[in-house]
Curated annotation (Swiss-Prot):
Part of the 30S ribosomal subunit. It holds the Pfam family Ribosomal_S10. One of its GO terms (biological process) is translation. GO terms for molecular function: structural constituent of ribosome; tRNA binding. This is Small ribosomal subunit protein uS10. NCBIfam families: PRK00596.1, rpsJ_bact. The gene is rpsJ. Involved in the binding of tRNA to the ribosomes. Keywords: Ribonucleoprotein, Ribosomal protein. HAMAP family: Ribosomal_uS10 (MF_00508). InterPro entries: Ribosomal_uS10, Ribosomal_uS10_CS, Ribosomal_uS10_dom, Ribosomal_uS10_dom_sf. Belongs to the universal ribosomal protein uS10 family.
Length: 102
């Protein structure tokens, strides 16, 4: 008999709300009797934008802006139907992107 697994990948710009969402998912899965692996922190993706400070000249004067994308991975092993239902009803913050693979 093959083991069933749900892989949940979370992304957010703020690590605090990301960790809170991961804790909610882990708590829900444990409460319904499923096995948990994670949350596993994945590498943080940094995107840097460099722009000129002045509108026309002075190319040596530049400003850099950075955007960080934090990621977490959670594996739910042998989920029950109750686990899937409770994960669907879970209310998570709007700043968290959720990717689910079965």
């Amino acid at each position: 008999m093959a083991k069933q697994k749900i892989r949940i990948r979370l992304k957010a710009y703020e690590h605090r709300i990301l960790d809170q969402s991961a804790d909610k998912i882990v708590e829900t899965a444990k409460r319904t009797g499923a096995g948990i692996s994670g949350p596993i922190p994945l590498p943080t993706e940094r995107t840097i934008y460099t722009v000129l400070r002045s509108p026309h000249k002075f190319k040596d004067s530049r400003e850099q802006f950075e955007m960080r994308t934090h990621k977490r991975l959670i594996d739910i092993v042998n989920p029950t139907p109750k686990t899937v239902d409770s994960l669907m009803k879970l209310d998570l913050p709007s700043g968290v992107d959720i990717e689910i693979k079965l």
